[in-house]
Amino acid sequence: MAAPEEKLPRKLWEHPNPQSTNMWRFIQTCNARYGLKMSTFQDLYKWSVGESRNDFWNALWSEIRLIHEGSYSRPVDPDARMDSIPEWFKGVRLNFAENILYTRGETKESRTTWDKSDDKVACTEVREGGTEVKDYTWRDLRRKVALLANAMQAQGVKKGDRVAVVASNSFDTLCVFLAVTSLGGLFSSSSTDMGTKGILDRLLQIDPVYVFFDDWAVYNGKTTDLRPKIRDILSGLAPLKNFKGVVTMPRFTYYANVSGLPNTVTLNEFLVAARGDYELRFERVEYRDPFLVVYSSGTTGVPKCIVHSVGGVLTSSMKEGKLHRDLGPQTVQLQYTTTGWIMYMSAVLSMLAGARAVLYDGSPFQPDLTAFIKVIGEQKVTNLGISPRYMHELQKNNVSPREVTDLSSLQSCTSTGMVLKDQLFEWFYDVGFPPHVQLANISGGTDLAGCFGMENPLTPVYVGGCQGPSIGTAIAVYDQTIEGGKGVKGVELEDGTPGELVAPLSFPNQPVFFWGADGAQKYYNSYFARFDDVWTHGDFIMIHPITKQIFFLGRADGVLNPSGVRFGSAEIYNVVEQFFPQVQDSICVGQRRPNDHDETVLLFLLMAPGHKFSQQLAKDVQAKIGQELSKRHVPKHVFETPEIPTTINLKKVELPVKQIVSGHTVKPSSTLMNPDSLKYYYQFADIEKLLEQGSVKSRL
């Protein structure tokens, strides 16, 4: 496996002064308050998910200092079933936008601007290639949000209404987010590169009152007029009961002419309804009231609409930001993301702590591979968020960020979106970034708007996996070979044994519901149908018995299981990437058709430009996998592929390919960036015929 028990992985980083961190100080506060003797991260984690976990949540509530009114008797009923979606901090009322735009004062209901003063820069907008850089102060932000919220209210937007954006990661998008949530409404965002069907698959389910839409988009050096897409969206949303129209936001200094579009106004025209009212007003709502709709990847159908609560996300985000990450007014956060991904929340939530958010829009590779890196240096970014795919591109092209620009301000770099391979951990420290930077491999996602595995300042960073769990959020590894079903109890495995990631205890940032008439059943089926009274997340993981790292080995539904030997596809990708530079990418799936007695592993290779696939290469790949892992890991068949299906967020999509080669017909999801790529794989459902005839079709 990726983390052998007999030896420790290579240590790459540790905090130079752990006693200076918020997490260490929090431990001392809890020790004094509850008569404890905690001294390590594991001590804190075990206490936070133990029998006294309500003590932990009480202490955390005092620590995070959210602006709120009302009071609670206990954080949660510890005996409530997890699938009942227990109510947290009942009696507390608060507002998302208020906590972003202000900081709590001396009393729980009061607010101050001490770390968000009028003249302090709140966010910086940077467009593709480091161009069009513009700073916005907290005063700018508060005034624009107030004007927009008052215009929305004048147009009838109220608590519980949905307002959507199809837009870039920009100042205007942020203002829409904060304006609708200031009124107690729900925010939903999609990126402009999504297809019309993908956007409608989302919006038709939630029936928004308004959709705020960029009028132009710029990506990868290409400028796109979005008005044809706006027209299609208007037509698609016309039957909805609550939908009033589209508001266009200017991508450039001028507005595109939208006079020919029905029910469409520009942002400036929309703001007239505010009548120049710059006073901020906040609707404080119940802790578990909804404020955000996000979406599952929808790789096998229409995406599920996951609804998160105001209090749950604020509590979880402050826990992660303040204690795990030491965020504060000195922080400069840049999360590379589109608005269509849950990581857009990460781009914004650092502002809770008074941080400056750098809102980057565009490709990180334009006009060249160093442009985005230069932005990190120029903006003196302290906390960077990127993906393994981005790091892989830098490594592949021999680009070393620390040789490109001054990264002395950078303290932490998070990576998420897919498994971070061991080779990239070592490249990060040996070649890529300064050794003082904490590489924070994190995993969690859309379902919880937070993390199951993440960094902390008290334990070292070793090669592979995540440093550890998120405090207060219990995780366990269950035996994946158990069939599961209603009422079936799972079996927890020892550390060092791979299995299925579960959360056995409720947490405040559980979604409050799924939108739609059949939302309750979809919610149950998504998380609770497999094992009784635990959240099953769908990841195949292992916890190192000594370091307690969490190794994410792949998706549980993509686990490979030839002859009863279970392993994750990430292990195969690791070997291919490390030893075969002529291969650009790969996808590995299990094939088990209705009449097959066992699963067969198929590996498809996408060749790099200028390189050709050969049977000798296939044999070399098989041999190296057997050498590096075991003979049982070796794919039975290795083929070339012209294209690998990915989502619009560039996540490799294994499940549809697995279903197709196993003899099923799959309807491509609207979230796939390249849905036609699936057609190629249908021929492998009759693999014996292909091998007999030697007639694999090499093109789509």
Task: Please provide the spans of the model-predicted regions.
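Conserved pre-ATP/AMP-binding loop-to-beta segment of ANL
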Residues: 119-121, 246-249, 254, 259-295, ...
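Conserved AMP-binding/adenylate-forming
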Residues: 132, 151-194, 198-200, 334-338
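Structural core segment of the AMP-binding/adenylate-forming
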Residues: 155, 182-269, 379-380, 387-388
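AMP-binding/adenylate-forming catalytic core of the ANL superfamily
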Residues: 165, 191-216, 377, 384, ...
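Gly/Ser/Thr-rich phosphate-binding loop
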Residues: 265, 271, 329, 353-355, ...
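Conserved AMP-binding/adenylation subdomain of ANL enzymes
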Residues: 312-332, 342-383, 389, 396-398
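Conserved ATP/PPi-binding loop(s) of AMP-dependent carboxylate-activating enzymes
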Residues: 483-531, 565-568, 665-666
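Conserved C-terminal "lid"/linker of ANL adenylate-forming enzymes
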Residues: 587-593, 602-604, 622-699
